[in-house]
Amino acid sequence: MCSIFECLLITAGYFLQSKGHCENCLKANRDPPKYHQEGFETRWSWSYVNYTWPSYDEYLDAAVSGRYLPQNILLGGPRVYQDKVYVTMPKYRIGVPASLGFFPLVSLEKTNILITPFPSWEMNHQGECRNLQSVIATEIDRQGIMWVLDGHRSSNYINGIRCPAKMVLMDLNRRGAVIQVVTFPNEISLKDGGFLNDLVIDETDGTYVYITDNSAIDPGLVVYSYNQNRAWKLRDGSMFPQVSASGYVIDNGFRIDYLGTIDGLALSPFTDIAPRLLFYTPLTSNQLFCVTTDILKDQQLASNQTWRRYVKFVGEKQGSTDGMVMDNKGNLYYGLIPQSAVAKWNIFEPLKTAEIIHRNPKTMVWPDSFSMDLQGNLFLVTDHAHRFFVNNNTLLFTPDEIKFRIHVIHVGTRSYMYSFSENFQK
């Protein structure tokens, strides 16, 4: 039986010269890194989020007026670039004054470190659609451009302004200068109910971005072509919840009955011998699917729905997943929400070989927002997200309870944006 990788190469019409050559090539590329894994370290933690305010008076005014309600702020999306860690604070509820920010990578503070709004307080002001409204996720490409997903449109009623979903490109080498704003029309992401959730960047054929729309009304996979400055959306039954995967209990008895659509996604590393693979999974599902990127890039296939025949069911994971990421050796790291755990699977092996590499019911509650730096480190956040998006759950200000943790582990590889042969910077 062929591996999922070999099967998809054949399906897409790409043939290797010989099976022996294929096995030797893949074996060379999947050798484990020669770096010791020390286990996950909790690098930073927060019991609540606060900001570097322009003045003490502005802080007091925000607290008194309700513009700043610390119990309502969720912290997620860590991305490391140079000397900063960028984080997101989506507006699931009122009282979130800034949706994108950063803190220093090197600091003596490890608990409740203050967040500086990025690129400015003004850009985070919710009164105008040109500003950031509710950022869920970001990704930073190899040139230092941050692709910011401002597409959580369930928050429009919170902001009091109906803004279309958008993606903002910021140059981190120029203090976050905005170089492009991509506004998505309603047929791509709903102005009321859209939920652009996660993204990966494919710097081939002029750069493409693949985005999951976790909308409960119109879920799908959005493809954006940078060269064409065009977007299209693919919809399929594989992107809907698996009802049997709900009803699990985490976080000291919190039952999760939420039915979430397509959410986590990961892109295989670049290789000269085949198109890349995009893996995705609904939030409420044990099922993992994939499709080759040459199919996704073909807008004509997307428009006539024939692309669906190329969607492949990879197999069953150990549980539901929110965040995931792939390194440049084909290792998929993904969260397991029901188990409060993180798992690892190499895509050149059967999915049944996947293993749980860390589990902790106290500190690994809702693992999400996986990312990698240039030094071979894997980052993720645990953020108790379930407490925020369940509307009937009352949030209290509990400054003694740690709610958000950014964990780090050294894996000795680079992110999916790099080829097999590129090693991390020591």
Model-identified regions with their sequence ranges:
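Short loop/turn segments immediately following beta-strands, especially the blade-tip
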Residues: P104-E109, L172-R174, Y226-A231, V291-A302, ...
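Surface-exposed loop and turn segments in beta-propeller and other repeat-based domains
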Residues: S45-R67, T111-R130, I179-K191, W232-I256, ...
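Blade-loop segments of beta-propeller domains
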Residues: V106-W147, G151-S155, G160, V182-E187
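Blade-level signature of beta-propeller repeat domains, shared across WD40, Kelch, NHL, RCC1
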Residues: S371-K426
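Beta-propeller blade signature
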Residues: S99-S107, R162-R174, V223-N227, L395-T413
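Beta-rich, blade/repeat-based domains predominating
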Residues: Y68-Q82, Q126-L149, E187-V209, F240-L277, ...
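Beta-propeller domains
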Residues: L26-Y68, Q82-M123, Y157-N159, C163, ...
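Conserved beta-strand positions in repeat-built beta-propeller and related beta-rich domains
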Residues: V87-R93, V148-H152, E203, Y210-S215, ...
